[in-house]
Protein backbone atom coordinates (compact mmCIF):
# COMPACT_ATOMS: atom_id res chain seq x y z
CA UNK A 1 0.00 0.00 0.00
CA UNK A 2 1.34 3.41 -0.98
CA UNK A 3 1.73 5.85 1.93
CA UNK A 4 1.91 9.42 0.62
CA UNK A 5 3.81 10.90 3.56
CA UNK A 6 6.35 8.12 4.03
CA UNK A 7 10.09 8.58 3.61
CA UNK A 8 10.04 6.59 0.36
CA UNK A 9 7.20 8.65 -1.11
CA UNK A 10 9.58 11.61 -1.14
CA UNK A 11 12.41 9.77 -2.89
CA UNK A 12 12.73 10.30 -6.63
CA UNK A 13 14.41 6.92 -7.14
CA UNK A 14 11.58 5.07 -5.39
CA UNK A 15 8.87 6.86 -7.37
CA UNK A 16 10.69 6.07 -10.63
CA UNK A 17 11.09 2.46 -9.53
CA UNK A 18 7.41 1.99 -8.66
CA UNK A 19 6.22 3.77 -11.81
CA UNK A 20 8.55 1.81 -14.07
CA UNK A 21 7.74 -1.54 -12.47
CA UNK A 22 3.98 -1.03 -12.61
CA UNK A 23 3.95 0.38 -16.15
CA UNK A 24 6.08 -2.51 -17.43
CA UNK A 25 3.72 -4.96 -15.71
CA UNK A 26 0.79 -3.45 -17.64
CA UNK A 27 2.69 -3.64 -20.95
CA UNK A 28 3.72 -7.23 -20.21
CA UNK A 29 0.07 -8.29 -19.97
CA UNK A 30 -0.52 -7.08 -23.54
CA UNK A 31 2.83 -8.28 -24.91
CA UNK A 32 2.15 -11.92 -23.97
CA UNK A 33 -0.07 -12.16 -27.06
CA UNK A 34 3.02 -11.46 -29.20
CA UNK A 35 5.42 -13.56 -27.11
CA UNK A 36 7.46 -10.43 -26.35
CA UNK A 37 9.12 -9.07 -23.26
CA UNK A 38 9.02 -5.36 -22.54
CA UNK A 39 12.68 -5.12 -23.57
CA UNK A 40 11.88 -6.86 -26.86
CA UNK A 41 9.03 -4.41 -27.38
CA UNK A 42 11.18 -1.31 -26.91
CA UNK A 43 13.85 -2.72 -29.24
CA UNK A 44 11.31 -3.37 -32.00
CA UNK A 45 9.75 0.05 -31.55
CA UNK A 46 13.20 1.70 -31.70
CA UNK A 47 13.91 0.39 -35.21
CA UNK A 48 12.29 2.40 -38.00
CA UNK A 49 10.57 0.36 -40.71
CA UNK A 50 13.15 0.71 -43.50
CA UNK A 51 16.15 1.30 -41.30
CA UNK A 52 19.30 -0.74 -40.87
CA UNK A 53 21.31 0.05 -37.81
CA UNK A 54 24.17 -1.53 -35.97
CA UNK A 55 24.01 -2.89 -32.43
CA UNK A 56 25.90 0.08 -31.00
CA UNK A 57 23.40 2.62 -32.40
CA UNK A 58 20.45 0.50 -31.34
CA UNK A 59 21.95 0.16 -27.86
CA UNK A 60 22.32 3.93 -27.59
CA UNK A 61 18.67 4.39 -28.51
CA UNK A 62 17.35 1.99 -25.89
CA UNK A 63 20.12 2.32 -23.27
CA UNK A 64 21.19 -1.33 -23.53
CA UNK A 65 24.65 -2.79 -24.07
CA UNK A 66 25.56 -5.37 -26.70
CA UNK A 67 25.72 -8.11 -24.06
CA UNK A 68 22.02 -7.60 -23.40
CA UNK A 69 21.03 -6.88 -27.01
CA UNK A 70 22.74 -9.83 -28.70
CA UNK A 71 20.71 -12.63 -27.06
CA UNK A 72 17.54 -10.55 -27.32
CA UNK A 73 18.10 -9.92 -31.04
CA UNK A 74 18.69 -13.66 -31.59
CA UNK A 75 15.29 -14.36 -29.99
CA UNK A 76 13.61 -11.66 -32.07
CA UNK A 77 15.24 -13.11 -35.18
CA UNK A 78 13.90 -16.61 -34.35
CA UNK A 79 10.42 -15.06 -34.10
CA UNK A 80 11.00 -13.49 -37.54
CA UNK A 81 10.69 -9.91 -36.25
CA UNK A 82 14.24 -8.80 -37.13
CA UNK A 83 17.07 -9.91 -39.36
CA UNK A 84 20.74 -9.54 -38.53
CA UNK A 85 23.06 -9.15 -41.52
CA UNK A 86 26.79 -8.62 -41.70
CA UNK A 87 27.98 -5.41 -43.32
CA UNK A 88 29.90 -6.05 -46.54
CA UNK A 89 32.63 -3.50 -45.74
CA UNK A 90 33.19 -4.81 -42.23
CA UNK A 91 32.02 -8.35 -41.44
CA UNK A 92 32.32 -7.64 -37.70
CA UNK A 93 29.53 -5.09 -37.95
CA UNK A 94 26.02 -6.53 -37.68
CA UNK A 95 23.15 -4.55 -39.18
CA UNK A 96 19.73 -4.96 -37.62
CA UNK A 97 16.53 -4.40 -39.58
CA UNK A 98 12.88 -5.34 -39.29
CA UNK A 99 11.46 -8.21 -41.32
CA UNK A 100 8.08 -7.85 -43.02
CA UNK A 101 6.55 -9.51 -39.96
CA UNK A 102 8.43 -7.09 -37.71
CA UNK A 103 7.08 -4.15 -39.70
CA UNK A 104 3.55 -5.56 -39.60
CA UNK A 105 3.58 -6.03 -35.84
CA UNK A 106 4.61 -2.45 -35.07
CA UNK A 107 1.15 -0.98 -35.59
CA UNK A 108 -0.62 -3.29 -33.13
CA UNK A 109 2.30 -2.88 -30.72
CA UNK A 110 1.96 0.91 -30.89
CA UNK A 111 -1.69 0.53 -29.86
CA UNK A 112 -0.57 -1.04 -26.59
CA UNK A 113 0.63 2.37 -25.39
CA UNK A 114 -2.90 3.72 -25.84
CA UNK A 115 -4.39 0.76 -23.98
CA UNK A 116 -1.93 1.18 -21.11
CA UNK A 117 -2.55 4.94 -20.97
CA UNK A 118 -6.29 4.29 -20.71
CA UNK A 119 -5.66 2.19 -17.60
CA UNK A 120 -4.19 5.18 -15.76
CA UNK A 121 -6.12 7.82 -13.90
CA UNK A 122 -4.47 10.84 -15.57
CA UNK A 123 -5.46 13.27 -18.28
CA UNK A 124 -3.72 13.58 -21.64
CA UNK A 125 -2.31 16.91 -20.45
CA UNK A 126 -0.86 15.33 -17.30
CA UNK A 127 0.64 12.50 -19.36
CA UNK A 128 2.14 15.01 -21.80
CA UNK A 129 3.64 17.00 -18.92
CA UNK A 130 5.14 13.83 -17.38
CA UNK A 131 6.61 12.78 -20.74
CA UNK A 132 8.12 16.22 -21.35
CA UNK A 133 9.56 16.39 -17.84
CA UNK A 134 11.05 12.90 -18.10
CA UNK A 135 12.46 13.61 -21.57
CA UNK A 136 14.11 16.73 -20.16
CA UNK A 137 15.41 14.79 -17.14
CA UNK A 138 16.87 12.00 -19.30
CA UNK A 139 18.50 14.38 -21.81
CA UNK A 140 20.12 16.43 -19.04
CA UNK A 141 21.36 13.52 -16.97
CA UNK A 142 22.02 10.46 -19.10
CA UNK A 143 24.14 9.87 -22.17
CA UNK A 144 24.44 6.25 -23.16
CA UNK A 145 27.52 6.92 -25.30
CA UNK A 146 29.40 7.85 -22.09
CA UNK A 147 28.98 4.32 -20.69
CA UNK A 148 31.95 2.04 -20.69
From Swiss-Prot:
InterPro entries: HTH_MarR-typ, Transc_reg_Sar_Rot_HTH, WH-like_DNA-bd_sf, WH_DNA-bd_sf. This is HTH-type transcriptional regulator SarZ. Signal peptide: none annotated. Induction: Transcriptionally activated by CvfA. Activates transcription of virulence factors alpha- and beta hemolysin genes (hla and hlb). Also, activates RNAIII expression, a central regulator transcribed from the agr locus. It is found in: Cytoplasm. Belongs to the SarZ family. Transmembrane segments: none annotated. Residues 9-139 form the HTH marR-type domain. Gene3D superfamilies: Winged helix-like DNA-binding domain superfamily/Winged helix DNA-binding domain. GO terms for cellular component: cytoplasm. Coiled coil: none annotated. The keyword Transmembrane helix does not apply. It comes from Staphylococcus aureus (strain bovine RF122 / ET3-1). It comes from the Bacteria. Residues 55-78 bind DNA. The gene is sarZ. Keywords: Activator, Cytoplasm, DNA-binding, Transcription, Transcription regulation, Virulence. GO terms for molecular function: DNA binding; DNA-binding transcription factor activity.
